[in-house]
Amino acid sequence: MYALGVLLVCLLGSYLFLFRLEHVRVLQEREKARYVVDSYATKIQYVVANAFSSAYLVEALLRQGEGRISEFYSYAEELVKMHPSTININLAPRGVVTKVYPFERNKKAIGHDLFANPERSREALLARDSGKATIAGPFDLIQGGYAMAVRLPVFMGEPEGDITAQEKFWGLICVTFAFPDVLDPVKLEYLDKHNYVYQLSRIHPDTGDRIVLLRSAETLVEPVERKVHLPNADWIQIGRAHV
């Protein structure tokens, strides 16, 4: 009887020891997952900001030309070469598209009023009213495929250069990118290769629902979560190592 009691105590001690080891291992894996999620969230922010720099370069040219870009198509061509995921670049004075590159496959966009389109107006209005670049999408393209866009509002003073004049809304610079191609430099596929399950989501601006943009094949269980702060939008990157 005494021997049985000793055996039970030893078994219980072994179980508690193993349980403790497993608990520590899970905590370590979770901490590692938190580091990985933070790293990739930062990468996504950087890659998106780098892609969106095209819009700011167009803005600089627009200001230099006091609201006009005489060589728009030449400059736009070079910007597309810099960011191969770019689908098109638009100039929209007062929200109405007047120039688009590449022209031939996007010429139907000429005359399109971004403020009048119920499916696209929300982000355009938010960009104008906030005075900040705003992400639209990702959304389905009419010609097929999936894309996201940046709407950059431009405000300018009087052409005479009166520094006391209040800047007025000129319009929007819109750059559209193929999605998820725009995120290729992030190398999300490395997460799968290194035994991580991940999911990238966004909050729908109208419904508040969480919409999954990209994910691993496996389902996440007790994931680590991190917001990805983007222009006038937040995405959510969540992930977890296999444990």
Language-model regions, residue ranges each:
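Positive-inside N-terminal membrane-insertion signal
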Residues: 1-5
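Juxtamembrane extracytoplasmic/periplasmic/luminal helical "stalk" adjacent to the first N-terminal
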Residues: 6-67
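Conserved small/polar residues in nucleotide/adenosyl-binding loops
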Residues: 241-243
